[in-house]
Design a protein with these regions (language model features):
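Nuclease catalytic cores that cleave nucleic-acid phosphodiester bonds
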Residues: 1-184
Length: 184
């Protein structure tokens, strides 16, 4: 599998980041977590993954110190400047068509879909070109209602069933993208 994963890490809860980290490491995928601050859980996972990969290389007979040093995790933490949409802009500029992107941010999802990326939210639901306009419209209506003091229904807290749903849908998406890539 050679496609990339891009994570809007500001909008993805820690429990879901762990699911993404484990899958990316297991499959050897390039995975970038983008946020306006460093996320300790991601940084630690990258260090642990790099250590495990270097141990594996040593076990396979690689002994040259420079060759060992070159072995690194394909997961990275990208810290962008604080500011409105700075992480979003970085993801849009960096993601290639057919990348898998994970975000809860509907305008970002729309921009990524226009670029030809696959996008899922923090519940594992896939954003599509067919439904993104409706989601953007709902977002505008909810924003207007909030400005009037009327609070629209919000998603509930992330719980174990939400995490399982995300994990299942994320795995299905990885399988689907892997098959698409193999077919090309």
């Amino acid at each position: 599998m050679l496609f990339e994963i891009w994570v809007d890490a500001d909008s993805v809860p820690k429990g879901l980041r762990t699911i993404i980290l484990r899958a990316a490491a297991r499959l050897g995928l390039s995975c970038s977590f983008v946020a306006d601050r460093s996320l300790p859980d991601v940084v630690q996972y990258i260090a642990d993954d790099t250590f495990a990969l270097r141990q594996k290389a040593r076990g396979e007979g690689v002994s040259d110190p420079e060759a060992i040093k070159a072995v690194r995790s394909r997961i990275r933490m990208v810290v962008v400047q604080s500011g409105s949409d700075s992480a979003d802009d970085h993801i849009v500029q960096s993601a290639k068509p057919k990348s898998l992107c994970i975000t809860h941010d509907i305008p970002l999802a729309s921009r990524l879909l226009e670029k030809g990326c696959f996008v899922i939210d923090d519940r594992g639901s896939e954003y599509t070109s067919d439904d993104i306009r409706a989601r953007l419209g709902d977002r505008l209506v909810n924003r207007e209602l909030r400005s009037w003091g009327v609070f629209a229904e919000q998603q509930g807290r992330m719980d174990a069933s939400n995490q399982k749903s995300f994990a299942d849908n994320f795995d299905r998406m990885l399988t689907r993208l892997g098959r698409m890539q193999e077919a090309n």
